[in-house]
């Protein structure tokens, strides 16, 4: 019994099929370059400091003056690496608050302390606490800008720290600020699961 001799057409079919199979398998195991570039670009723009690992780098307290100092870094639709209420700044009652705002993203951002009740506001311009907002709250500050918010808080309450640029807070750029009557010192970190 003899095997059939490959014809000219059949001679190229096997290498072609093997080449296509290699291409398909090889491509399916690699990351898409455009996705990898977007992910690395986002990682590069996201602040390296996350509160769950560096609380003391973001919040401090002077007990003598009852002053909480908080560093608020605006990243790509996040605060200090958190968004959508996933972090909470907890402060003692009647504290004096100093928020050092750092705009670290290429998209304009601002900050405002808004009510913690009801839906997340679409934009700023209606602070829940007097003087608790940055300059250019609706238009936002450019990358590299800094600002300082100084205000006092009441005995208790739940608020949101939002980006006041229209659509940013509803897009997830907000975290909680809670005035806890039992708190003796401030803290900042992931919001406890309820």
Predicted feature descriptions by range:
Residues 23-26:
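C-terminal motif of bacterial Sec signal peptides marking the signal peptidase cleavage site
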Residues 63-96:
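N-terminal edge beta-strand
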Residues 29-50, 135-194:
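Extracellular/periplasmic metallocenter environments
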Residues 40-70:
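A eukaryote-biased signal for short, well-structured alpha-helical docking elements
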């Amino acid at each position: 019994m003899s095997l059939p001799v490959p014809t000219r057409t059949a001679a190229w079919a096997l290498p072609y099929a093997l080449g296509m199979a290699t291409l398909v398998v090889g491509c399916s195991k690699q990351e898409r370059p455009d996705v990898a570039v977007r992910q690395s670009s986002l990682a590069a723009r996201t602040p390296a400091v996350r509160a769950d690992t560096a609380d003391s780098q973001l919040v401090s307290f002077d007990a003598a003056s009852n002053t909480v100092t908080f560093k608020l870094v605006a990243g790509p639709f996040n605060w200090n690496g958190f968004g959508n209420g996933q972090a909470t700044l907890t402060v003692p009652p009647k504290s004096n608050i100093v928020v050092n705002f750092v705009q670290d993203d290429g998209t304009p951002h601002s900050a405002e302390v808004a009510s913690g009740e009801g839906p997340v506001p679409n934009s700023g311009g209606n602070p829940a606490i007097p003087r608790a907002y940055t300059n250019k709250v609706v238009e936002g500050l450019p990358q590299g800008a800094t600002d300082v918010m100084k205000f006092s808080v009441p005995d208790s309450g739940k608020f949101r720290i939002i980006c006041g640029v229209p659509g940013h807070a509803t897009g997830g750029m907000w975290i909680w600020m809670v005035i806890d009557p039992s708190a003796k010192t401030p803290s900042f970190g992931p919001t406890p699961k309820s």
